[in-house]
Amino acid sequence: MEKREELYAGKAKSVYRTDDPERFVLVFRDDTSAFDGEKKEQLNRKGMVNNKFNAFIMEKLEAAGVPTHFEGLLSDTESLVKKLEMIPVECVVRNVSAGSLCRRLGVEEGLELNPPTFELFLKNDALHDPMVNESLAVSFGWAKADELARMKELTYKVNDVLKKLFDDAGMLLVDYKLEFGRSGGQIVLGDEFSPDGCRIWDKETRKKMDKDRFRQGLGEVIETYEEVGRRLGIKFD
């Protein structure tokens, strides 16, 4: 597989074309940002940690019947992925109240949400990823009703798989965001799953073990990401 020109560079990942028009190389960089890019930093080993973390999670989800774009690791910081037509709507499931939910509704952090909540957000940094609903998504042509239903179904299936995985390792999966795309008429999980895009707490101490460590200046960001990975059985070296 020959890696060719860069197609897109996001805040923490880059996408490269390959000699196969249906395959891309996803490169995880050491760049870290928060608050729509207002806070930025380079964190050593982050690209490697998130790449291997994502590979582990994607393989678990594939084994559970969730279709993903992940095809395999190419190097410490690179993965081979299927080309998707991405849907510009993020799916968010919350098992515990935290983050924007608390700010928006004035609820305290740490409340168990039963059943877990499901929300949609438009992927748009300039607008700060506003919350939207199925009606808006269909009316503006971001996704069809049946696609949104499938995205919701898969997002909850991911929760069933990963909530138990983290719980068995002594951690709470507080919330997470997923992005989906289209491939051959199928809805497929794209982007990544890493501590950058979810909230993870220690089950006993409620220690934050995700990107909130960077957002809130708690320190030991990558060391904590690696601790999460080790608890799950991920080998980084």
UniProtKB/Swiss-Prot annotation:
Pathway the protein takes part in: Purine metabolism; IMP biosynthesis via de novo pathway; 5-amino-1-(5-phospho-D-ribosyl)imidazole-4-carboxamide from 5-amino-1-(5-phospho-D-ribosyl)imidazole-4-carboxylate: step 1/2
- An MF annotation (GO) of this entry: phosphoribosylaminoimidazolesuccinocarboxamide synthase activity
Give the species.
Marinobacter nauticus (strain ATCC 700491 / DSM 11845 / VT8) (Marinobacter aquaeolei)
Q: Which reaction does it catalyse?
A: 5-amino-1-(5-phospho-D-ribosyl)imidazole-4-carboxylate + L-aspartate + ATP = (2S)-2-[5-amino-1-(5-phospho-beta-D-ribosyl)imidazole-4-carboxamido]succinate + ADP + phosphate + 2 H(+)
Q: Name one Pfam family in it.
A: SAICAR_synt
Q: Which Gene3D superfamilies match?
A: ATP-grasp fold, B domain, Phosphorylase Kinase, domain 1
Report the PROSITE patterns cross-referenced here.
SAICAR_SYNTHETASE_1, SAICAR_SYNTHETASE_2
InterPro entries from the entry?
A: SAICAR_synt/ADE2_N (IPR028923), SAICAR_synt_PurC (IPR033934), SAICAR_synth (IPR001636), SAICAR_synthetase (IPR050089), SAICAR_synthetase_CS (IPR018236)
| Any one GO CC term of the record | cytosol
**E.C. number, please?**
6.3.2.6
Instruction: Give GO terms for biological process.
Output: 'de novo' IMP biosynthetic process; cobalamin biosynthetic process
Q: Does the record bear Nucleotide-binding in its keywords?
A: yes
Entry similarity comment? Belongs to the SAICAR synthetase family.
Answer whether the UniProt record assigns the keyword Nucleus to this protein. no
State the UniProt keywords alphabetically: ATP-binding, Ligase, Nucleotide-binding, Purine biosynthesis
Protein name, UniProt field: Phosphoribosylaminoimidazole-succinocarboxamide synthase
